[in-house]
Amino acid sequence: MTMVYANIFLAFTTSLMGLLMYRSHLMSSLLCLEGMMLSLFVMMTVTILNNHFTLASMAPIILLVFAACEAALGLSLLVMVSNTYGTDYVQNLNLLQC
């Protein structure tokens, strides 16, 4: 494993740990998800370029489109929750509360 792959894997792992540990605010969760998607995009692009997969060259662009859609939906959810509840705490999103 080269240093490029190790750094990208470390970025993905750091974003995943941030998502699992700091779940109090919705904005921090969205930032961690964006970090994970960005590291997956870079890993997929580097792998395709190193292995000369010409048939899979559209896959990183498709992943980037899905990441942009996920970011737009996440930001709209953040605006809706902050307008409704006044904060962006994740515990306010629990549907089982009375």
Curated annotation (Swiss-Prot):
A Gene Ontology biological process term: ATP synthesis coupled electron transport
One of the record's GO molecular function terms: NADH dehydrogenase (ubiquinone) activity
Location within or outside the cell: Mitochondrion inner membrane
Reactions accelerated catalytically: a ubiquinone + NADH + 5 H(+)(in) = a ubiquinol + NAD(+) + 4 H(+)(out)
Stretches that traverse the bilayer: 1-21, 29-49, 61-81
Pfam families: Oxidored_q2
Topology in the lipid bilayer: Multi-pass membrane protein
Listed EC numbers: 7.1.1.2
InterPro entries according to UniProt: NADH_UbQ_OxRdtase_chain4L/K, NUOK/Mnh_C1-like
Keywords: Electron transport, Membrane, Mitochondrion, Mitochondrion inner membrane, NAD, Respiratory chain, Translocase, Transmembrane, Transmembrane helix, Transport, Ubiquinone
Gene Ontology CC annotations of this record: mitochondrial inner membrane; respiratory chain complex I
Family, as annotated: Belongs to the complex I subunit 4L family.
Its job: Core subunit of the mitochondrial membrane respiratory chain NADH dehydrogenase (Complex I) which catalyzes electron transfer from NADH through the respiratory chain, using ubiquinone as an electron acceptor. Part of the enzyme membrane arm which is embedded in the lipid bilayer and involved in proton translocation.
Name used for this protein in its record: NADH-ubiquinone oxidoreductase chain 4L
Organism: Neomonachus schauinslandi (Hawaiian monk seal)
